[in-house]
Amino acid sequence: MAFLKAEAMVVDGKQVFVRADGRFSIDGESFPIEKTLQRNLADNANNIPIVNFLLTSFPLARDHYLIKLQQFVNGMLWFRSLGFNEFIGLETGGTALEEYIIKNKLIDDFRRFLYNVSGQEFEFATPGTGEKMLLCIIGKRRVPFMGIWSSGTQALELLYFWMQRMGRATFVFIDEFDAFYHFKLAFEVCKILFNKDCQVFTSSHNTYLMTNDLLRPDCNFILNENKIKPLVDCTDKELRFGHNIEKMFRGNAFKV
């Protein structure tokens, strides 16, 4: 079982609270707490996060920074598709992707998405009453979509599902997002994701994506041996829009 060893919050350079090594202090003007309770929070035997305690114990204005923090955290999402689908955040339970597409009358939109991003054309059958699985028409046969898709198309279905949810997201991290994509498809997916109205992080081994056509160098990060640094902090060279960032990377111009 995990335990919080230390917590601290600083807002605009002002310390709100700090709890560490059995000690606790808080901005008493913003959050007046009696001494006995402060001692209990210092010990915190039941492992209650201080932020959660403040959110549930004090009436706060709608624009209070703790409310904004809570809204941001509640809008965070992590997902990936590496053989099977996984996610954390934004939703409380699993959803059958194809049932969702059918129920929300998104079949034609999903078909257009697949064509626009990957060039693939599918003819989906009109679902019958109670059908929860997408069926493709091949010749005169109705074939389950999942029976003919590639791993990349399967990953695109998951991406499409979460894109319908990203209007409520604040921060999205897609782990190994292009594990089953070819280079051009990964590039097209990035163009869509990076135009969303939320913060999006993707992880990849594809250096083809290290280009100013997608992101500025300060928005590209290198992860190596538990360290993460933006490209601009990995070199003394001046980085300009016309530079071939991938070529520089392959030439060992960046050091973490």
Residue ranges, per PLM feature:
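A short, sequence-level motif marking secondary-structure junctions
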Residues: D21-S25, M146-G152, D233-E238
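Short polybasic amphipathic segments
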Residues: A2-V10, G22-F24, G130-G139, C219-I222
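Secondary-structure transition/turn motif
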Residues: A8-G13, E29-S30, C136-R141, L231-T235
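C-terminal lobe/lid and adjacent interdomain/linker elements of RecA-like ASCE P-loop ATPase modules
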Residues: F187-V256
